[in-house]
Amino acid sequence: MSPPAPDAQPSSGSSSDNSNADSKSTTPPPPSSTTSTTSAAAISAAVVPDDNLTCRWNACNQKFPNPETLYDHICERHVGRKSTNNLNLTCQWNSCRTTTVKRDHITSHIRVHVPLKPHKCEFCGKSFKRPQDLKKHVKTHADDSVLVRPSQDNHNQGGMNYRPHLNKTPSYYDHNGQMRTQYQHHQPAHPNAYYAPQPSTNYGLYFNQPPLNNHQRTEHLGYGAPPGGYDRKRAFDMVDDFFSSAKRREIDPSSYSQIGRSLLPLHGTLSIPSGPMPATEQHYVPQPQHAGIAHAGPAPTQNPLAQQYYLPMPPNARTQKDLVQIDNLLGQMQDTIYENANHATAGVQIHHGHDHYSGYRSSQSPPIAQRGSPGGMPVGPDGYHQPVSAATMASPLTAMSSTGTPAVTPPSSAVSYTSGHSPSPSAPAMSPQSRHSSTSGSVMYPSLPTSLPAVSQGFGQSTTTTLGPSFESNERRRYSGGMLQRARAAPPRSTDNHNHNHNHGASTPKAPVSPALASPSSEVSDVSEATREREEQYDRWLENMRVIESLREYVRGRLERREYVEEQENEHQGQGEAARKERDGNPMDVDARSPRSPAREQPGRPREGSSLYPILRMPGD
């Protein structure tokens, strides 16, 4: 009954085919035993009915054995070619009447009418008529990373199972329409992730777009400018102008005001990395894992779609001599900014940050901290507070920003990090009371006013630029901020009012007054305005320190990697330009020369500006 039904179907089909062959004798009988082992063309020919293999171009009505033959017939017979003067660009399949401008377009359009699907997907085996249809379909596989469900063979490869496709490496189409191959089996890829190549270190400055990964660390000086080429070139020119001004002594390294004005155009332009160097330590916080998918392989270090733009070396920082000179000038500017830290950070509340990269320091500076943390306790990567001791806590005079920039501590070696000057719970000269006050004061402490000359001297804080406190003990303790603030809060309110009225005068801030006697609106406005000014001043100082450290790190990195032009090569490159300048009387020479000095000097004697520029010899000298 039901079993012989399939056998009867081919017989009826063959009888009908025989009748058609007797009438027209044009269509051969279909193959009697077509199986899945034949080619795709044979499969399609066995599945496609005879009505779909009939040419419907005008009144042709010719039948063909397979879709390939029908397609070739339409292209050669009805479409024609320009070389044979029979090119037809209008589709006449039934009532289509689609007109194109090229032969390739009409031949691609004909695939819509012909049941020909030569483009097969490697992943699922589905066939398509046109290559653009296959390309759109393959992108769906690229979105789900061609991963099978976790329930299928999880015990084989730990959940990272790719579908086997005829022993070929899985591939996908990227967003640019190009075929990409996946990683090898010994490098399982992260799901739903693309991996960008590491940035090259053979160039000078490179510009990048803001990355998606927040833990990126770059070895070069990057610019977080918008994608526009003008903004990247403008930032590059500003850095070069700063190097030029520093080399020509247009900026006084000992003047904080001049340094601040010269660094103001660079604020917000340089991208300060916030993670460790790739060569020292790799930190990556994985995303929440999905069920059945194992995360492994290298972590992505950068936005996959971020483009990198490389520019040549700055003209004013090409040679080794230029880099050494700029590094020395930047060091002097950094010392000047350090010395002005007491005035810039006065009255600004700075707490220990929650960044778990606090163990990394790029320069001689205390551990990382940031301003504005409510509790002042270090927070681990899991979001919980970690145990802390008095030796690891940061005081307000040793705080830093969240990007690793030192806040107040000078770069001098007057106070060592590992010597007996550093505080620790087991210090012999520390009593339990002083130890408790230094520990609690470094965690929670009020903000200090802008200027406290009498109080700071009375309580033992030093007014020198080294910011080293003086106590009755022999130890130079660096936790003076907590001690000073705790001692300031100890006297009663009446004593503070008496001292305010008789001793301090207008320079001392007002003591706390009863809320019933004070005007809340005026006090809140005055405090908010003063706090805003102090915070803006601190932000400017902090940004200056960030820019200086970034520039100095960039210069030192180039010196370590020997990314500079040799002196002899630089002389040969600038020999023609120097000859032209000498002939024209050096119109662009800005070196400081004495008006009595001759225009041309002796060949054997160096110029006064030899420390800034190499000596260029003329061929006739």
Swiss-Prot record:
A motif (YPX[LI] motif 1) lies at residues 445-448. Binds to DNA. Residues 400-421, 433-472 have a biased composition (Polar residues). Activated by C-terminal proteolytic cleavage by signaling protease (probably palB/RIM13) at neutral to alkaline ambient pH. One of its GO terms (biological process) is positive regulation of transcription by RNA polymerase II. Belongs to the pacC/RIM101 family. The gene is pacC. This is pH-response transcription factor pacC/RIM101. It comes from Hapsidospora chrysogena.
